[in-house]
Amino acid sequence: MTRTEIWNKAEKALFEKYGESPDISIVNRFLSEKRFLADYGVAEYFDELAGICRESIDKYNEKLIAKNTVSCSLAAYLLGASEINPLPPHYYCKTCKRVEWVEDEKCLFDKRSTRRCECGAEMQIDGYDIPWETYLPYAQRLKAKDPVPENYKDLFEALTKKHFQWSLLGAAQAVNLLGQATGISPDEIDLNDREVKYRLLGGDFICMHPKLAEFLKQAYAVVHPCSYAELLKLIGLAHGTGTWKHNAEDLLKNGKCRLADIPATRDELYMDLQLDMIIYRQNETGFALDVADKARNGYYLKHGMDNYTVEMLYELRYDDWFIDYLLRTNYMSTKAFSVMELKYFILLTWYQTYYPKQYAEVIGNDIIW
């Protein structure tokens, strides 16, 4: 399949989900990705990955998940390479294709899963608000000037797979098995279930990865989240390196900032800076993406921060604690991975809450993290 055919395939999927005349912001998002990413050949990777994911389900009944950076792309989602819709939170109607944006929440897990549409049908909530621009540095590094020699094809494929981090998550497979055992599909579950939310925000991490559960127990002693949006922040900090210990933890303990002020992932950092560039400078020159990419790989920790960046951050009304936070950060994870992880923990906790017998029979202690 040619590059053009793959993008046409993604466009067709867009129309199937959002109708023949999608909301203009959805169209702009898709066209922006197509304009900037098409030349790097990422659509071919997305399509290949989607095929592997489908094959894993068809042949082995196992869910294969592409995590991290690939999940920031709307095209990847439309092609089936990612299950994370990166658009801002919104309700959409499968019947009339109406879209209603959620303006008052940063995390759709904090909103009820359904709403009644004007046409009388039930609207579903979707969208995790992840920018595609954070994928651009990866796309640029992927593009090769010369064809890959035949004798290096296997190595190239191995590196490609590593780059996209194709992984079978134990939690995803566990949710799939629980859906079969209970007859309740994960797609039918309200992700804002009151009892489940009470358990997770209250510190009940029995269905979580042991290492993450241990981190959250310690983090809850410093700051107790009141919403899934705040819990998502903590999960993002947990997957970073140098983002929590002797950094965000100390900032919160010393009252330098609130949890909501801290960019836990590279995507949040980019979006915050991009918005402030537009507000205070009336333009976005690439500064936000440059800072986010350097913070992502610990550039500022290793090399320090140049005067231009420091002066620009001050101009954008950022305080010293924010600059110190970036200087101490060694690696920033992706929002998509945190979103996916929290989603599966919510689903597992739901099954454990309402179907404890089936949960014990199917899962027990056999989740392979």
Q: Can you name each region flagged by the protein language model?
A:
Residues E20-I65:
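Helix-rich "cap/lid" substructures immediately adjacent to catalytic or cofactor-binding pockets
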Residues M1-A10, I52-S56, K63-A66, V70-I367:
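Mg2+-dependent phosphoryl-transfer active-site scaffold
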Residues A10-Y18:
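A charged N-terminal "starter" segment
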Residues F15, V27-K34, A213, L251, ...:
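A generic structural signal for ordered alpha-helices
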